[in-house]
Amino acid sequence: MTRPKPVALCILDGWGLSERREGNAPLLADTPNMDRLMATCPHATLTTFGPDVGLPSGQMGNSEVGHTNIGAGRVVAMDLGQIDLAIEEGLFAQNSRLRAFIVTLQDSGGTAHLMGVVSDGGVHGHINHMIAAAKALADENIPVVIHALTDGRDVAPRSALGYFETLQAALPDGVEIATVTGRYFAMDRDNRWDRVSKAYQAIVTGTGRKAASASDAVDQAYGQGENDEFISPTVLGGYTGAKDNDGFFCLNFRADRAREIMAAIGDPDFTAFETGARPKWASLMGMAQYSEAHANYMTTMYPKPEIVNTLGDWVAQQGLRQYRLAETEKYPHVTFFLNGGEEVSFDGEDRLMPKSPDVATYDLQPEMSSKEVTDAFVAAIEEGYDLIVVNYANPDMVGHTGDLQAAMKACEAVDQGLGRVLAALEKAGGAMIVTADHGNCDVMIDPETGGPHTAHTLNPVPVVVVGAPDGATLRDGRLADLAPTILHLMGLESPKEMTGKCLIS
């Protein structure tokens, strides 16, 4: 048979499948192009959570996990499960890099500053990791303060008080919460440095809104209409900022939303905003490696495993050309995460990153930059690349706002783009897999509370093959099966490291 060219992978980020109509943006939206694909093309479903993507049972998937598994073509054991197991087996406190952090602070006489998301969402961090780290340090008589990042995005929008109750009941005597900051400020990934600056000032200099306690900070925020995600950086009690010889440990294990705040705290060449005189840190550490640049000034408790012969690497080894495309909110996912944690592009790999719109929240502009992404997608098809990987951010990013009407508009914007892409693909004689990395906007109303649902879901996601061989059918599978399927469409054998199986029969 004639091999299609290009072969494209189109990831509709956060587009899950559910038969429940209430709050189901993809089902309620007007999406004629996606409807046509589901009616006329081979399709099935993929599992994007739990052990099928290297996470603990019942743990929802996310974009980092999803794109890592997609690119690897195998199930990749993720940081959450690795850290959970170490805590369960009593090995967390014995970690050699944590021990080195402890010894350094014993020598310097400084305080350990622990920063991380305080929830059990498990997407960027976990409250249990905060508790384990605080205990490990306090057991060695290291003074500990906590910089709590409230979630409200991967968990219910107003759930922080319960998490603080859990945290404070488990913390050793003497460990204090020094600041409370909504993740909107401290966990930005789109160069919104005005937000990051406010988080930095509270955490490092002790400057910001004041409250007597964590619960007071939350009550104060709710009184001003701020949900957990948006709590203004708040300084508690008598905290006056970090000092020379202190140490800083970021407990978030996901890289993309830890990079900016940690660069502000520790990068010697940081210039994005005026930090003032920073403390002379005795030690800086992250739960995971946030980037190769970060590794120049901070250590890593759990270094990333090497993932060889990823989809992009394997295609490059065959001398073929590939193209990666996403707006800034999802750009790391189709590059860094899809490439198994490699920052540098492979030979023959071109990239484009349209800027995400400069709005406070994406329900205000649910189309985001989908038109620019579609324009570039169509141009890449016409350019003659062998492989194109594209992420549409809208269903996920707007899904996180909890606004059903906006999420429907997001799905419709993506579907309109899909129509243009399909026309260009048919003209070029290409093939395409349309899928998602996890669910999100398929549940916009919490079935238990009736309030907004802002987190990812445990629903399956669609997988559709456009331009499949005649008579082809698809089986249900998992994200690790996508790379072998793409390589099959390209007429390439899979490398032996890819244990995923082709979905086409």
UniProtKB/Swiss-Prot annotation:
Keywords: Glycolysis, Isomerase, Manganese, Metal-binding
Catalytic reactions of this protein: (2R)-2-phosphoglycerate = (2R)-3-phosphoglycerate
GO BP: any one term: glycolytic process
InterPro entries (alphabetical): Alkaline_phosphatase_core_sf (IPR017850), BPG-indep_PGM_N (IPR011258), Metalloenzyme (IPR006124), PGAM_B_sf (IPR036646), Pgm_bpd_ind (IPR005995)
Pathway involvement of the protein, from the record: Carbohydrate degradation; glycolysis; pyruvate from D-glyceraldehyde 3-phosphate: step 3/5
Cofactor: Mn(2+)
Keyword Kinase attributed: no
GO cellular component: cytosol
Protein name in the entry: 2,3-bisphosphoglycerate-independent phosphoglycerate mutase
